[in-house]
Regions:
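NTP/phosphate- and nucleic-acid-binding module
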Residues: 62-587
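HTH DNA-binding helix-turn interface
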Residues: 2-6, 27-31, 44-45, 51-61
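Short, amphipathic alpha-helix enriched in basic
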Residues: 13-35
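Append "Primarily bacterial transcriptional regulators
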Residues: 18, 37-42, 50
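Short coil turns linking two alpha-helices in DNA-binding domains
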Residues: 14, 46-47
Length: 587
């Protein structure tokens, strides 16, 4: 009996070592590239011992999931109870869990700590939980990653395990299919393949836009400027570095300093702007304002810098430097609803252009905020009233507003069903007060304006990342960095190919020519891999009759067309910013 127990302990220890080895390896590289040799070397266990318990690395991961599923089937009740702060600290010290002790020690002395028990497993958790494990029908461990304790690079790196569960297996399968599609669309992978941007270790979190990426970015900015000019906005540009005094006035120094980059100039404290708003206040104050000047809609494509922890950086989605498409609208109280409606209409135009559906959320006052209860109530009801007047469905997020005012957030749904928060409308009565903004009313008296902060794209860089994944790199023609690729069949047709290229460029179409001495099939495939909307094959027949053979990303072989006909068709597609639907997939 004693020998059997001892053997069981050894087996448990061996399996634990193998699981820990797999966990460490999954932090370092993709799961698919991990071999049994990697695992046994990491665990310092021989191969024979590994195979005594598992067929391969996949079997090891599946056994971990199987153990989880076994717990689910046991239909274990999940019970909640509380301990005093002192008892909770003593409990976890006995269990040798210093991280949980540290969390509890940060809580007030009179705090009651909630615990949850599931079978023999007990843990600290705020909850709430299910009543039992039974409703969890489908489980999948998706990945593991390293994470510094409390997000601080100076602390020990721990293992973060990612998993997902659904009440039905079909829902899990649908989610896993979406994950696979997301991997194919990863903007970091496509950004490199399509030559759009790069990231360097010399500037972590600071993206480098390459020539094609700059074409894409500038095309978006041109659209932004055109749209805002039509909507009655003026554009300004404010400095990147501004004095500490400004940030103290705005409240950022007290509420946001940990995310700001600071420096000294001539012995004075300065900060690189994390937001465009305070500079916009100075623009408003630069001259006297009258009620006749309001609403004043001021837009800025401002470069901002925010310190993000290295573990939170992610391609273009989470960076330390980005262009914010801010606008500040200064208005009278009577103009609030109409201006909010105008902003909603503008944001709807932007998202509709790219085929995004969206839902709306209203976020209210957070714990760390400034301003009176009366101001917050008035601002919140202003946003709520506008949404109600527009007949928009919305969800209320209590306590999730900005520190200076409530906000409306727009959450986009992309082509594979993921949601992204982009557009924001924030009603602010605090900054106009802190900066002592005024206008002369119809009564000749001085009044304080109300202000809206709003963004449509949000971060331009992040929006580009979203677009790359939404379109899988296959951008609409108007947005594509290269819209047409001219493909001469052989060197004999280079001269005609150049003539076609010159005609396209003269019409304002972004075009390139492939002059390499490669087979035409290879050239076509290369252009397809670069997601180029149109390929024009030119040979002897095309040259003789001033034609082009058109292949498109949307319909495959579209046959021969006159060059003038093709140019007219594509310039119309670009001018109207049309999105052609794919009717035939290219092989």
């Amino acid at each position: 009996m004693t020998g059997a127990v001892q053997e069981d302990k050894r087996i448990r220890r061996t399996k634990k070592l193998l699981r820990q080895a797999l966990t460490r390896l999954m932090q370092q590289k993709d799961f698919q590239s991990i071999t049994v040799t990697d695992v046994v070397r990491e665990a310092d266990i021989n191969r024979g011992t590994f195979y005594a318990h598992y067929r391969d690395v996949y079997d090891l991961r599946e056994k971990i999931e199987a153990e989880m599923k076994k717990i689910v089937k046991e239909d274990l009740p999940i019970t909640r109870y509380t301990k005093s702060r002192a008892d909770a600290i003593a409990y976890f010290k006995e269990k040798n869990e210093p991280y949980k002790v540290e969390l509890i020690e940060d809580l007030p002395e009179d705090a009651q700590i909630s615990f949850y028990q599931q079978g023999e497993f007990v843990d600290l958790c705020a909850g709430p939980h299910l009543m039992t494990t039974k409703p969890v029908k489908a489980i999948k461990l998706t990945s593991l990653a390293g994470a510094y304790w409390r997000g601080n690079e100076k602390n020990k790196m721990l293992t973060r395990i990612y998993g997902i569960s659904y009440p039905k297996k079909a829902q899990l399968d649908e989610y896993l299919t979406m994950l696979e599609e997301a991997k194919k669309r990863d903007h970091r992978k496509l950004g490199k393949e399509l030559g759009l941007f790069m990231m360097c270790e010399e500037g972590p979190g600071f993206p480098f836009f390459l020539p094609k990426g700059m074409v894409l970015k500038n095309t978006l900015l041109d659209y932004w400027r055109e749209l805002h000019k039509k909507a009655g906005y003026v554009e300004v540009s404010t400095p990147i570095i501004l004095s500490r005094h400004l940030w103290e006035t705005s409240g950022h120094w007290d509420h946001y300093k940990e995310n700001m980059y600071t420096t000294q100039i001539d012995g004075e404290d300065f900060a690189i702007k994390p937001m465009n708003c305070p500079g916009g206040m100075l623009v408003y104050k630069a001259e006297p304002r009258s009620y006749k000047d309001l609403p004043l809609r001021v837009g800025e494509l401002g470069l901002v810098h925010r310190h993000e922890k290295s573990g939170q950086l992610h391609g273009l989605m989470r960076v330390r430097c980005f262009t914010q498409d801010d606008a500040h609208i200064f208005m009278t109280p009577e103009q609030i609803k109409d201006e909010i409606k105008g902003v909603v209409h503008l944001i709807n135009q932007v998202y509709s252009l790219f085929g995004f559906k969206y839902h709306v959320e209203l976020s209210t006052r957070p714990e760390d905020s400034m301003g009176s209860d009366e101001d917050w109530e008035l601002a919140t009801e202003g946003l709520r009233g506008a949404l109600n007047d527009l007949g928009l469905d919305y969800v209320v997020n209590e306590g999730d507003g900005a520190f200076y005012g409530p906000k409306i957030d727009f959450h986009l749904t992309d082509s594979i069903g993921r949601t992204w928060q982009c557009g924001t409308i924030q009603l602010d009565m605090q900054l106009p007060q802190r900066f002592e903004l005024e206008y002369t009313g119809a009564d000749g008296e001085k009044h304080r304006p109300i202000m809206i902060h709003r963004v449509a794209f949000g971060s331009i860089e992040r929006f580009i990342g979203i677009l790359i994944e939404h379109f899988a790199g296959a951008f609409p023609t108007w947005l594509a960095p290269v819209q047409v690729k001219v493909l001469p069949i052989s060197d004999k047709h280079l001269e005609y190919g150049q003539k076609v290229l010159d005609t396209l460029n003269a019409a304002g179409i972004r075009a390139e020519i492939d002059t390499r001495a490669e087979k035409i099939g290879y050239k076509i495939r290369e252009a397809q891999m670069q997601k180029i909307p149109y390929m024009l094959v030119v040979g002897a027949k095309e040259e003789e009759e001033n034609l082009v053979s058109v292949r498109s990303r949307f319909a495959g072989d579209e046959g021969q067309k006159s060059l003038d006909e093709f140019v007219a068709s594509v310039t119309e597609e670009i001018a109207t910013r049309a999105r052609r639907e794919v009717v035939k997939e290219e092989n």
